């Protein structure tokens, strides 16, 4: 069955916690995601939790991952089994035109993101 990653990405980015998302599942048993947390949400969340507002530090923090997982789970609750995002990791930086990860019309460049995050995607399927 084919899944529309754009539909799932669109639903993920409607969540206040998630600014950008790239969903991958080409010829794989399930979908995984590379996510960019919303910086405003992240700063507010970190302040309430008394944690640093730096994604590099927060990405490994269990409470932060759980908060993002809850956003993913909210979306998964509206999706069919094959559309659910099972695992995710965080992008190293937002997707932008300048880093060539987005087109001028603000669409993600899937082929570039797949290359940039090849190791993270592979790790999500291994783990």
Sequence positions of predicted segments:
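AMP-binding/adenylate-forming catalytic core of the ANL superfamily
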Residues: 1-83, 89, 94-99
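A short N-terminal helical cap/helix-turn-helix that marks the beginning
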Residues: 76, 83, 117-127
């Amino acid at each position: 069955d084919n899944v529309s990653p754009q539909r799932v990405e669109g639903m993920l980015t409607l969540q206040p916690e998630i600014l950008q998302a790239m969903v991958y599942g080409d010829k794989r048993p399930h979908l995984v995601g590379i996510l960019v947390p919303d910086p405003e949400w992240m700063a507010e969340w970190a302040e309430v939790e008394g944690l640093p507002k730096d994604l590099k530090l927060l990405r490994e923090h269990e409470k932060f991952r759980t908060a993002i997982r809850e956003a993913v789970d909210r979306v998964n609750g509206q999706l069919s089994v094959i559309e659910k995002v099972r695992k995710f990791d965080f992008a190293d930086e937002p997707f932008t035109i300048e880093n060539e990860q987005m087109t001028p019309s603000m669409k993600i460049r899937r082929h570039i993101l797949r290359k940039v995050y090849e190791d993270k995607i592979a790790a999500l399927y291994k783990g």
